[in-house]
Amino acid sequence: MVEASEGTLEPIGAVQRTLVGREATEPMRADIGLLGAILGDTVREQNGQQVFELVERARVESFRVRRSEIDRAELARMFAGIDIHQAIPVIRAFSHFALLANVAEDIHRERRRAIHVAAGEPPQDSSLAATYAKLDRAQLDSATVAEALRGAVVSPVITAHPTETRRRTVFVTQHRITELMRLHAEGHIETDDGRNIELELRRQVLTLWQTALIRLSRLQITDEIEVGLRYYAAAFFKVIPRVNAEVRNALRARWPGADLLDEPIVAPGSWIGGDRDGNPNVTADVVRRATGDAAYTALAHYLAELTACEQELSMSARLVAVTPELAALAEDCAEKARADEPYRRALRVIRGRLTATAAEILDRRPQHELDLGLPPYATPAELRGDLDTVDASLRAHGSALLADDRLALLREGVRVFGFHLCGLDMRQNSDVHEEVVAELLAWAGVHPDYRSLPEDERVELLAAELGTRRPLVGDRAELSELADKELGVVRAAAHAIRRYGPAAVPNYVISMCRSVSDVLEAAILLKEAGLIDASGPEPYCPVGISPLFETIEDLHNGAAILHAMLELPLYRALVAARGQSQEVMLGYSDSNKDGGYLASSWAVYRAELALVEVARKTGIRLRLFHGRGGTVGRGGGPSYEAILAQPPGAVNGSLRLTEQGEVIAAKYAEPQVAQRNLESLVAATLESTLLDVEGLGDTAEPAYAVLDEVAVLAQRAYAELVHETPGFVDYFMASTPVSEIGSLNIGSRPTSRKPTESIADLRAIPWVLAWSQSRVMLPGWYGTGSAFEQWIAAGPQSRAERVDILHDLYRRWPFFRSVLSNLAQVLAKSDLGLAAQYAELVDDAALRRRVFGKIADEHRRTIAMHKLITGQDNLLADNPALARSVFNRFPYLEPLNHLQVELLRRYRSGDDDELVQRGILLTMNGLTSALRNSG
């Protein structure tokens, strides 16, 4: 057993008895020790002493590598030739430990926040309490706040992800372990039903060990839909209504004259089942399944909660009075039972009408139905009205305490989830729209060769078509398979809107949008499904069209495209029909793959500035949708800091952002963690909207000029490696598991948009995931070191003066500070020693030396530049929590990386044993869980 210290971690299989190191981390280390001990015991009992000793030996040797006591090659030799039947349990052991360590870290964060609050210390940044204090100090007037927060919305949009393949069984078991560890952290020995907590933990870990972590078959879209919906029962149904009510009440208390937030501020969305960009598996049936399952989830939840409310609100008319409205509602219950229990009778009426609603709009029947022969609710507002009647009666007769419990959450839930649960966005590539619209125009005899037209003639033709009511084709038109499929999808969306309301499919996103005609082509498809009618004086447009600007060039051109869109009278009328609101989506992933981290980050910032200016000049309300991935290489990083780093006017009360894969699980799988993360999003949105957070003042333009220059240098350095180095694609394909990401059973979507090995056609997720698995993390930092080094050396000022300029920007500018903070996180998680092991998978020695040499040189250069600009010797000096997490868990990743390299070598040498393939997939999932934002 290795003695625990700040430099080591508890061994799997041995409880840490003596806690040392910083006092604040001792409880977390004890939790990790307990879970590690239970896991170790389970491995020994289930797989034998030999496997346990192999796991322990791997752990010990990994620590020796980290302390530079042995060369990494020794650990690699330990796994060379390992029997696959021994390799699998070793991989599973370290993967499970990563999962359990995540639980311990999450519990510890909750514990530290509770201690912080109990000690009466000032609220922490990113909390709503801290934000309210800042708003109080700003002394804002009601009119300013009312205008700024008009139509405010914070929308995390759940998307599918190829590495989030955990089965529901694993998800539920992990949740149970978290609940048990929370009780343990509170000092309990037994659960509420008298079970010994440690014994129950052992049961759950045993269940986890005996449950397959991953599916044997490729993940289907229906699986991904189920994965996305599980977060509602796990957290969203409780947390989102609570956050919405708390924020509305807090803001109205401060500005009672502003009449704030009539609509919920937090409103979730989804792409799962609607995003068909490069995914041929998304069809009309899938759209119907996604929207139908979402509606089922919402109504099933309401029926269950109404049943629980019935049981709880048992008040007798002999003891309490009720309002006339409540009495009238209860009278609609024809049942003779419960004659003196008006609240129960009223709630049964509501449940009966909701049962009728479910029968009318759902394709399957939920539990807790009650058929009373009553009419269905026409809208969620009608349901909410009846719930408000119950609430008002309770409050009017001394029962506010009861009204503020389950009923309050249900009322808020109906406000935000409606009958649709969450808005499903549609997304498709502009090239597909162009091909389909050209076919429709030719079929209708409008133009035989639309694709040959120049842009101005395209716009003129499309605008004319949108101004007519007639469709281009009928249901019986003989079209290509692609056109039939695309029309089927938008018609399925129209069906969902008719069934579940306009919020069911609120947006249509156009990938790779490069022109006004790209926007109008999408509008034509929506018109064919009856979702746009611009022929009359009051246009109908329930679905907003969101251009997505993804590449560096498209981000540069985005504002001009938006301005041209708004110059078209017909399109401007559609925007007016949607309350003068226009959404624009910004792509972090493809712009990063296109130009590198720094160039991409700055291109997005510049695009936002320009888009905000267009919105100001044209009088529209702009909402930006951030296509952020989990990793820094795909726009990820701490959301609070990222939102505060937005330019002035970019947030404007509203924000949408994608949440993906293992990041969803890390943020939203547990109610306490979910509440903290949602509050953080709202807090940052309020601050960015109502306060001056940029902090540059009159020095903004000189600061922008500096980043203009640095971004050009960064993009040049990145392009020199990724786009111009001969053999780079071959190196990438060989030195990372990118090929296996596509060939193994990961995700429903192909890894490339087209069947090529081009970096341009490769999707951003496998691009980033592959570099993360190999521990290079290249998309999150490459080119940045060279750019800063060259900029410092190139100017008219002295080197010291140039460094001072950058340091001053780091100190004063949230955007620049966020860029360098995210950069540091990626560098801290990278490991060029392990990356060298992956480089050995490249057969061409000269290519290996050339490319890896450039990567290693730039890595050293980037770390040096970060230190120079920030003045921090430690990459994570400003993030001690992450520093401890990285330090504690990384020795446990070492075996996973070495085993992945070993199994990749075997697989590529022709060993197609199913266990070898499964082992590779297990290492991917283990590393993903441990890194928590790897793809």
Swiss-Prot record:
EC assignment: 4.1.1.31
Gene Ontology MF terms: magnesium ion binding; phosphoenolpyruvate carboxylase activity
InterPro entries found in the cross-reference section: PEP_COase, PEP_COase_bac/pln-type, PEP_COase_Lys_AS, PEPCASE_His_AS, Pyrv/PenolPyrv_kinase-like_dom
Keywords: Carbon dioxide fixation, Lyase, Magnesium
GO cellular component: cytosol
Catalytic activities: oxaloacetate + phosphate = phosphoenolpyruvate + hydrogencarbonate
Active site: H161, K593
Uppermost EC category: lyase
UniProt xrefs under SUPFAM superfamilies: Phosphoenolpyruvate/pyruvate domain (SSF51621)
Gene Ontology biological process terms from the UniProt entry: carbon fixation; oxaloacetate metabolic process; tricarboxylic acid cycle
Coiled-coil stretches noted in the UniProt entry, renumbered to this chain: none
HAMAP family, alphabetized: PEPcase_type1
Family to which this protein belongs: Belongs to the PEPCase type 1 family.
Physiological role: Forms oxaloacetate, a four-carbon dicarboxylic acid source for the tricarboxylic acid cycle.
Protein name, per record: Phosphoenolpyruvate carboxylase
